[in-house]
Amino acid sequence: MNYRGKMLSKEQAQVVMRDFMQYVDVCIANDEDFEATLGIHTFDGDLSTGIDQIDTYKEGMLEITRQFPNVKSVTSVLRNMHTVEEGDWMGIYYVDGKFYQSPIHRVHSLEAVGAGDAYGAAFVHGLINGFDPQKIVDFAISVSVLKLMIQHNFNVVTQEDVFKIMNSKNTNLSR
């Protein structure tokens, strides 16, 4: 969904997105998007406790599929931000009546710009390449946390780089 408050008010975004949702079958939304674009409350806005509020995210994902029956799956990144540079990140994916969760990664970020876009692109990559649901969410969050460790807007990593993160037992990541 990618809500941008400088472009539209929440009220304007909700009018536009609610109309647009009839054409959506896969919904990628971040923590702000649920409420800002659809009026669905998922968490209290405290980025230091996003992962801790996973049950409200799950309820929000279910609510999207109830309000918009054409939406077959919903995915999001959840974060517990300890500082601007330090945080825990995970992905969650709802499809076919089941929730899939990635491991939680502790990340020291160089720059957060583009991490959500990286997640979305990697998620679509997993869908296109026929990954199973767990692999999709694991792959997407791995690409996203790799982007956090790269400065500027270019996430130049290979699929092999991502698989190394996915297969690593170490979830404390830094570069």
Go through each PLM region and give its residues.
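Conserved phosphate/ATP/ADP-binding segment of small-molecule kinases
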Residues: 2-97
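Generic alpha-helical propensity signal that fires on short helical segments
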Residues: 39-47, 52, 89-94, 109-111, ...
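Short flexible/disordered coil segments
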Residues: 52-71, 90-94, 130-149, 169, ...
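Conserved post-catalytic alpha-helical subdomain immediately downstream of the catalytic base
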Residues: 99-168, 173
